[in-house]
Regions:
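A short, acidic/glycine-rich surface segment
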Residues: 7-9, 101, 180-182
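Aromatic-lined glycan-binding groove of carbohydrate-active enzymes
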Residues: 183-200
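Alpha-helical scaffolding within the catalytic cores
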Residues: 40-44, 155, 184
Length: 200
């Protein structure tokens, strides 16, 4: 994300993957998240990462569990799951994008999707089942609260963690939490055992 942005491709759109990996390595990073410019096949991605002495530390998966069944989502995640397992990624950054305003500059943040109590309960059951599945696959689900999505605020994030199985872990994004006027330190204190990945 420091070199190019999948939500806004015009940010760093002309930055090559090689420049991104080279500069990340030179800066002292030993791991990097996948992005839109990264190869989607392990036989292509692994040599590219090795060339710059980098490991795959995670990457974004945009889910549609609000509209898909768990089995449908399991089928859709298979290619990325295989890629991440082949690359020995420690987790998968997982976010709900159904109805999200991402990629649509004409939509206001205030129009983001929201769930009523009935839908929330069903969603927590689905995400718990998905968390257990990915845990069994050795690829923990690290849920990313994100601006413009159904899980955006501190309240959304707390409610998600309080109502889902412990297999649903957390990607704490301090920038998104600040933007949503939430308290990252409180999340860290209250849910430290669920936190496995961070964006700062």
């Amino acid at each position: 994300i420091a070199w190019s942005n999948d939500d806004m491709p015009e940010l760093g759109g002309d930055t090559t993957l090689e420049q991104c990996l080279s500069e990340a390595s030179q800066a002292g990073f030993i791991g990097i998240e996948s992005g839109g410019k990264f190869p989607k096949k392990s036989e292509e991605l692994i040599p590219k990462l090795n060339e710059f002495n980098l490991n795959l530390c995670s990457g974004w998966y945009g889910a549609n569990l609000r509209t898909n069944s768990v089995n449908e989502e399991k089928n859709l995640i298979q290619d990325q799951l295989k890629l991440f397992k082949d690359c020995n990624s420690p987790c998968m950054v997982f976010a709900e994008v159904s109805g999200s305003i991402q990629g649509d500059p004409n939509r206001k943040l205030s129009t983001r999707p929201q769930m009523d109590l009935e839908e929330s309960k069903k969603y927590y059951e689905k995400i718990s089942e998905m968390g257990k599945y990915l845990e069994d696959e050795g690829m923990p689900l690290a849920y990313h609260h994100h601006m413009g999505t159904v899980i955006e605020t501190e309240e959304d994030t707390v409610r998600l963690l309080e109502n889902t199985d412990d297999s649903v872990k957390l990607t704490l994004d301090t920038g998104h939490m600040l933007f949503a006027q939430g308290d990252s330190l409180k999340i860290l204190k209250d849910f430290s055992e669920r936190l496995i990945h961070m964006h700062c």
